UniProtKB/Swiss-Prot annotation:
Cofactor binding note from Swiss-Prot or TrEMBL: Binds 1 [4Fe-4S] cluster per subunit. The cluster is chelated by three Cys residues, the fourth Fe has a free coordination site that may bind a sulfur atom transferred from the persulfide of IscS.
GO biological process, one term: tRNA thio-modification
Record InterPro entries: Rossmann-like_a/b/a_fold (IPR014729), TilS/TtcA_N (IPR011063), tRNA_Cyd_32_2_STrfase (IPR012089)
Protein name, UniProt field: tRNA-cytidine(32) 2-sulfurtransferase
Organism: Nitrosomonas eutropha (strain DSM 101675 / C91 / Nm57)
Catalysis performed (reactions): cytidine(32) in tRNA + S-sulfanyl-L-cysteinyl-[cysteine desulfurase] + AH2 + ATP = 2-thiocytidine(32) in tRNA + L-cysteinyl-[cysteine desulfurase] + A + AMP + diphosphate + H(+)
Localization per record: Cytoplasm
């Protein structure tokens, strides 16, 4: 009886989470015009939770959306020691997904250049990016899809602000630095914890990301922990911060290259949007980015935890 109840609850949670993730991906794709009819999309698959979820959701979209587009999964085997070469080909063959495994020994290059015990992620990423751009050209891909999510975007924003002195995040859609490809991030509106929960429920064959032995990026880890503490103490803060990235007012920053502060003159016309220079701005009591789904998600999580701790499941 307990097993049946748990099974039903698990199935309900999986379906609810799947629908939410699909809706968020669909919204991001529509907002940024990420996918167009006739696209050939190269989905970069690392074997981690995010790229698995990305491929899974895009396959569902391909089956049900009115747009006609192709998907091809690409994995870069960087020859890291212990990398399970059979996992991704087995999974992709099982789901009848066209794929290509690219073998390129970037691991040896990184180990030769970066001192032992240092973070190798930056160089590894640059080498991987170059290979993937080349493969995208060979495949005739019109878009390159990456599995970065909302938390990645916010982390990058704070990394650039705190350590780089720039207001710069990770765009949901951009032209690649070689100028030849359009890169999209369909998971831009998805929370990392939702993707982690989905991967666990669906049981993707996850490949560990630390096979290279690299030390963690300490700066990114500091930012990640800061965001986790904020979210725990002030629920909804991350949603509000992400909303802020979509609501930029250049006239209220201080970048003279982006806004003509030099040419400002009074125009004699009162506007509701005008700045009340001497007034403290009234802010809403509830976080701006918090919506019904976010609140429901928090409640579901709290109820599930309470049920488990209370022994009702």
């Amino acid at each position: 009886m307990i097993t049946d109840t748990f099974s039903r609850k698990s199935e309900y949670s999986t379906n609810k989470l799947r629908k939410r993730l699909r809706r968020l991906v669909g919204t991001a794709i529509a907002d940024f015009n990420m996918i167009e009819s006739g696209d050939r999309i190269m989905v970069c698959l690392s074997g981690g939770k995010d790229s698995y979820a990305l491929l899974d959701i895009l396959r569902n979209l391909q089956a049900h959306a009115p747009l006609d587009f192709e998907l091809i999964a690409v994995n870069l085997d960087q020859k890291q020691p212990g990398f399970p070469e059979h996992v991704l080909p087995g999974y992709l063959s099982e789901i009848n997904m066209p794929f290509r495994i690219v073998e390129q020994d970037t691991y040896s290059v990184v180990k030769r250049v970066i001192p032992e015990g240092k973070t190798t992620c930056s160089l590894c990423s640059r080498l991987r990016r170059g290979v993937l751009y080349r493969v995208a050209t060979e495949l005739g891909a019109t878009k390159i899809a990456l599995g970065h999510h909302r938390d990645d975007i916010l982390e990058t924003f704070f990394l650039n602000m705190f350590y780089g002195g720039k207001l710069k995040a990770m765009p949901p859609k951009l032209v690649s630095d070689d100028g030849c490809h359009v890169v999209i991030r369909p998971l831009a509106y998805c929370k990392e914890k939702d993707l982690a929960a989905y991967a666990q429920l669906v049981q993707f064959p996850i490949i560990p990301c630390n096979l290279c032995g690299s030390q963690p990026n300490l700066q990114r880890q500091v930012i990640k922990e800061m965001m986790q503490q904020w979210n725990k103490k002030y629920p909804g803060r991350l949603e509000t911060m992400f909303t802020a990235l979509q609501n930029i007012q250049l006239s209220h920053l201080a970048d003279t290259s982006r806004y003509d502060f030099v040419g400002i003159k009074p125009h004699g016309i009162a506007t509701e949007e005008g700045d009340k220079a001497f007034d403290e701005e009234l802010l809403p009591d509830s976080p701006v980015g918090m919506n019904h789904d976010d609140a429901a998600s928090e409640l579901d999580e709290a109820c599930s935890t309470e049920a488990v701790q209370g022994g009702t499941i």
